[in-house]
Amino acid sequence: MGEAAAATEALARIQQRWGVGVIRRGRVVTDPQLRGLVVRSSGFAALDALLAPRGAPDGLTLLRGAVGSGRTTLALRTAAATQAAGGAVAWIDASHTFDGVEAAARGVQLTSLPIVMPFDINEALETAGSIIAADAADLLILDCAGVRGEARVDGLERLAARARRTGAAVIALVDSAEGVLSDLALECSTVGWLRIGSDVVGRKMCVALRSGPRRDAQVLIDVLEPRSAREAIRNERIAAE
C-alpha cells in the first residue's frame, strides 16, 4: 500500500472511532519514492549542524520549554521544512492550542497537514500510534504541553518504539521530560529580543541538546516574527521619508 493510501485509511479509521470532527483539515501528501530519504530539518542551519544528517532522528524527540520559549515555533519550522523536502507531516493537538495563522506564517502547508484534536491524552496517543503503524507520516508532531501522568510517559515510550520500527520521527512538545526515555531532547528558552528601532520583531532563542541531566551542546538562533518584522520595516521606511 502506498503512503498516501495508508494515510487515507489511517485517518478514516480515526474518524470512524472518534468522529469526523476530530480531524480539522488537510490530508497527508508525499512522494512514496522519498520514503526514508526525507530530511527532517529544523529550519535553522545552526541547529541542523548539531543534529543527525537527516535532522530529527527516527523515534522520539522531546521538545521542552516554558510557554513563550519558542518550542512551538521550532516545531512549526521543522514541519514546514519537512514538507518542503517532500515529507508527510501530521499534527496532533492534544493541548488544543494550534494556530493556523501562525503555522502558515512559519511556512507550513496547511492543505497538506492533517490536524487531529483528540479529547484527551489517551486518545492522542492512540491516534498517533495509528498514524505511525500505518506508515503514514515521515514526521508526527504531538503537542501534549500541559499534560502529565504515567499514561503520557508510557504512551510516549511505546510510540517511540513504533516510530523507530517504521523509520518515522515523533516530536513531542512537553513542559517536562521527567521519566520519559527519548532519542533526543531539545530544551528551548528565550534569551533576548530582536528589534528594529523600538519594535520587537523576534527573539533570540537558545536550544540545548540534552542527554539526561547533562547539557551536551547548545546553539543560539534568531527567530523573526514575520508579521512584526514587516510592520516594523514599513514604519521605519515611513519615518525616514
What are these regions (language model features)?
Residues 51-55, 83, 129-136, 164:
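Signal for well-folded cores of large energy- and translation-related assemblies
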Residues 3-6, 10, 39, 43, ...:
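Helical mechanochemical/support elements of P-loop NTPase systems and associated helical scaffolds
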Residues 168-241:
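Phosphate-binding/switch region of NTP-binding enzymes
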Residues 81, 102, 162:
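Hydrophobic/aromatic ligand-binding patch that stacks against planar heteroaromatic rings
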Residues 145-182:
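Long, charge-dense, solvent-exposed interaction surfaces that engage phosphate-rich ligands
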Residues 78, 128, 159:
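Aromatic/hydrophobic pocket-lining residues that form π-stacking "cages" and hydrophobic walls in ligand
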Residues 86-154:
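Conserved inter-motif catalytic segment of the P-loop NTP-binding fold
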Residues 1-91, 238-241:
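Detector for small/aliphatic-rich hydrophobic stretches
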